[in-house]
Amino acid sequence: MIETLKERVNGDAALVRRGRYLTTTFLLEIGPAAWLISIFEGRIVSVTSGPFVMPSSSFALRAPEEEWTKFWSRRPPPGSNDLMALIKRRVLKAEGNLQIFMANLRYFKEALAKLRNDGAAA
């Protein structure tokens, strides 16, 4: 499923435009599975699956697989419908240079919501 993130995000011109000043690599952990996602000027250029020995990323988003499953459901329940709600419930850990994450929060919310069963934005 994560493999489709590149085509889903890059296929949304409005989302790419929103992230036009964003160039970074971040780590997404879904339970024991890890993914390095590289973004250049709002376009996802690579989605690489782990495991990684020493991953180089600006920041990391880590949550159990069951929490991501709820987040990516067609109609996520309250508390699982938004990245900040997951952080507030302390099930999503955001670590590293959070300035990049917070400055582009809407981009990351919409990009990760593209993996929902219906592909809707956040």
Question: What positions do the PLM features span?
Answer:
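Feature captures hydrophobic
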Residues: M1-A122
